[in-house]
Amino acid sequence: MKPLNVIFAGTPDFAARHLQALINSEHNVIAVYSRADKPAGRGKKLQASPVKMLALENEIPVYQPTSLRDEQAQAELASLNADIMVVVAYGLILPKVVLDTPKLGCINVHGSILPRWRGAAPIQRALWSGDTETGVTIMQMDIGLDTGDMLLKTQLPIEDSDTSASLYEKLAEQGPEALVEALTGLAKGELAAEKQDEALANYAEKLSKEEAELDWNKSAAQLWREIRAFNPWPISHFSHQDASIKVREAHVSQSKSQAPAGTIISAGKEGIEIATGDGVLTLLNMQLPGKKPLSVADILNSRSEWFTPGTVLNSTKEAE
């Protein structure tokens, strides 16, 4: 097998982990593309991306065009004469002329089993929708949004304890291995591309802070999924006592209740039970404004009067 000459394009830490795997592999990373340095910290000094820093540590040339629609940037990329371009969380749109420049085109590492979740938030939407598994897809890029042919897929069971943060970490380990395996398969001519089934495709919309507000009229199971999906950002929350209270951990209770949605059923060291549109949700870990996350037991030590059974959350008229 002849090692491939690879251009790598990426920006955040997730991408840097994939670059490290390529550096450690038998393939040759001949250039790295990354977003422009951004002001960071109190001094607003320009901060290089994790991908750029890793490239410089390994003496790999770094390119930071503001756009790849620019003819000069396109000519510069073409002059590198790469076999393939690997794109992981880069942040710039690749026009068709760039996708067609490397001999084997451009491939992408996507954080879901395509075509299940295309778009910006596949990890979060898998949790949000109650999927039992996720994974990584290595995909041949085309001009569509995550619509290209699939080259290699991995699978990862979603555990009840998983949050978006934990799945991100697991996929950040799976992705680099899958990427190197795919490149080696392409170099050997052993990978067969598979078309995506459009009928199975969903768009994973970006998350918003507004979406993370807990709606007690939803089922306990759906609220539990949302709390996990929105951790570490934007964190599920509800308004109570003129405060926005974040919920970092919860589970679906075995308790039953006929109380209106949002009613506190019980409050003790085991958790705060809330009636929902279907079932009961137990809150386990919360965060009051300006405070660090605490177990419900610790919060009740100082704020028990906020969570008296019978109180209705998100209600203008709370129980006496």
Swiss-Prot record:
CDD domains: FMT_core_Met-tRNA-FMT_N, Met_tRNA_FMT_C. Gene3D superfamilies: Formyl transferase, C-terminal domain, Formyl transferase, N-terminal domain. The keyword Transferase applies. It comes from the Bacteria. The keyword Metal-binding does not apply. GO terms for molecular function: methionyl-tRNA formyltransferase activity. GO terms for cellular component: cytosol. Keywords: Protein biosynthesis, Transferase. It holds the Pfam family Formyl_trans_C. InterPro entries: Fmt, Formyl_trans_C, Formyl_trans_C_sf, Formyl_transf_N, Formyl_transf_N_sf, Formyl_transferase-like_C_sf, GART_AS, Met-tRNA-FMT_C. Its EC number is 2.1.2.9. It catalyses: L-methionyl-tRNA(fMet) + (6R)-10-formyltetrahydrofolate = N-formyl-L-methionyl-tRNA(fMet) + (6S)-5,6,7,8-tetrahydrofolate + H(+). (6S)-5,6,7,8-tetrahydrofolate binds at residues 112-115. HAMAP family: Formyl_trans (MF_00182). Attaches a formyl group to the free amino group of methionyl-tRNA(fMet). The formyl group appears to play a dual role in the initiator identity of N-formylmethionyl-tRNA by promoting its recognition by IF2 and preventing the misappropriation of this tRNA by the elongation apparatus. This is Methionyl-tRNA formyltransferase. The lineage of its organism: Bacteria, Pseudomonadati, Pseudomonadota, Gammaproteobacteria, Alteromonadales. The gene is fmt.
